[in-house]
């Protein structure tokens, strides 16, 4: 499913990092996705599952400060599903622009993430949209495709380092 939207991202052995660390180092380039982050994989899989369900949502809403919002925006636009993303005041402007560029309605509310999250729940009721948490099962299944690609290409790894924010990247591993 993910590869119907974009091809597998590359992974390369990095000689300079390998030399500096004293071991073989491979880097998986998730910056080659349409949103420059692995999270988009989860949005694609989640929205596909929701649209195939007995009761597809009329829209999605979520609070975030980053790539989760881009993921839902991109996948929602591809599926023709409206997406509203709520971010707190002072959120990174590059993230805000990216979320909007992928087609989501951006709402800026509250001084911190929790205030933005609470506002998203209020808007969920008003709009009749489905709320999306950043660690839902289908999101994690989609995110896991990065690990599948990596392990299909490099199968003798001792250690894997993964960025951890809300946890979908490590959960997908």
Show the residue positions of the predicted features:
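PLP-dependent amino-acid enzyme catalytic core
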Residues: 1-173
């Amino acid at each position: 499913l993910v590869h119907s939207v974009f091809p597998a991202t590359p992974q390369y052995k990095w000689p300079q990092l390998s030399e500096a660390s004293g071991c073989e180092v491979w880097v998986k380039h998730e910056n080659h996705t349409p949103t420059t982050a692995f999270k988009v994989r989860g949005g694609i899989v989640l929205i596909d599952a929701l649209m195939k369900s007995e009761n597809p949502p009329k829209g999605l809403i979520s609070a975030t400060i980053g790539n989760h919002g881009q993921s839902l925006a991109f996948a929602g636009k591809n599926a023709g599903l409206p997406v509203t993303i709520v971010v707190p005041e002072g959120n990174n402007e590059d993230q805000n622009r990216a979320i909007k560029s992928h087609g989501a309605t951006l709402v800026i509310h509250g001084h911190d993430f929790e205030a933005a999250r609470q506002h998203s729940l209020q808007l969920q009721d008003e709009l009749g949209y489905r709320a999306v948490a950043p660690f839902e099962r289908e999101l994690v299944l989609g995110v896991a495709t990065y690990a599948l690609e990596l392990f299909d290409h490099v199968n003798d790894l001792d250690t894997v380092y993964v960025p951890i924010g809300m946890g979908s990247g490590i959960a997908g591993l």
